[in-house]
Curated annotation (Swiss-Prot):
Induction: Induced by auxin (e.g. IAA). Accumulates in response to salt (NaCl). It is found in: Vacuole. This is Serine/threonine-protein kinase VIK. Its EC number is 2.7.11.1. GO terms for molecular function: ATP binding; MAP kinase kinase kinase activity; protein serine/threonine/tyrosine kinase activity. It comes from Arabidopsis thaliana.
Amino acid sequence: MSSDSPAAGDGGEQAAAGTSVPSPSYDKQKEKARVSRTSLILWHAHQNDAAAVRKLLEEDPTLVHARDYDKRTPLHVASLHGWIDVVKCLLEFGADVNAQDRWKNTPLADAEGARKQKMIELLKSHGGLSYGQNGSHFEPKPVPPPIPKKCDWEIEPAELDFSNAAMIGKGSFGEIVKAYWRGTPVAVKRILPSLSDDRLVIQDFRHEVDLLVKLRHPNIVQFLGAVTERKPLMLITEYLRGGDLHQYLKEKGGLTPTTAVNFALDIARGMTYLHNEPNVIIHRDLKPRNVLLVNSSADHLKVGDFGLSKLIKVQNSHDVYKMTGETGSYRYMAPEVFKHRRYDKKVDVFSFAMILYEMLEGEPPFANHEPYEAAKHVSDGHRPTFRSKGCTPDLRELIVKCWDADMNQRPSFLDILKRLEKIKETLPSDHHWGLFTS
């Protein structure tokens, strides 16, 4: 981890007294170091690593006021998870006990929402107040479903048959199982009963349902309904028999250019739909695990999992949003997200480039790095190396454009679609491909 030396900092302030003005490269190095430390302190606060948090604060005490995209401080993060030692360290270094995030929640409000009793007592002893949507000073109101009253997507829990349920996936908020609804196999995201009263969880659940209700496209996983009036909360989508792209690539390895382009076209069609103005939906977590195969024949893909997506009303096509948190998966993360800078829908284009690279190469980008280190490597300007003979010059050029460090230089998904269609015309069918590569 790089850090700014005190001598260098003093020299910059004394430039008027005769020392030279720092070069642009020096300024860039300082910016990289600052961004890296901001990311690290939020990460270590989340991981309950008090020693690492202390080390960072000793090097740069201003990091105690670091913020992510949602304006959450390290104190918010640690308080939510109940990490006592981390919170004590942050308070020792002068953390604002009543800092408010974008929803006006204080750390105490988060601790109350997560029912962390010891944390609640600790924060109160340091003058913590409970304000925001999650706090005790917020007037409790019943949580309505995204579309009010008797909507036709509300599903009665009794209609769901879990007698032969099979686990598909599991996360911190709940699990996804294959079940049956009116005789049809479906995928059910089921929120853990212990979290069904958590306002933050309910807020995220409502957001995902509200988003999915609006989506209708052949390359987007189809929303079928939800259980919002009883516990546990459940979200029901179509069940896709082919599994996810991550598992498919793990089993198959690198794909032929023709197959990779066909897969990429499906992803790009879905993303073009999501990015359509004026209601732009930024996925923010586009990765192989969130791309699903319709069947075992793998002839059709759909984009799914909108838990981290954001619906943005665009005033003009060049709008950039103040979204600076490390939202999404590190290995596929755009550098501007990792660096906590302003970003827009082009973050999805970057992730798409990494997926297309993985489809052709047969392994994840920077597979020999841990996910966080891979994201840091990318933010420092590095990109994965092309090794596959199947990566044609046209495909390589497209990938390089899509993972450009400057988000403004990345093409739109509509442009990507046009490029892919042209590339597809130049490729042989799969059963002829071996003749060209043997």
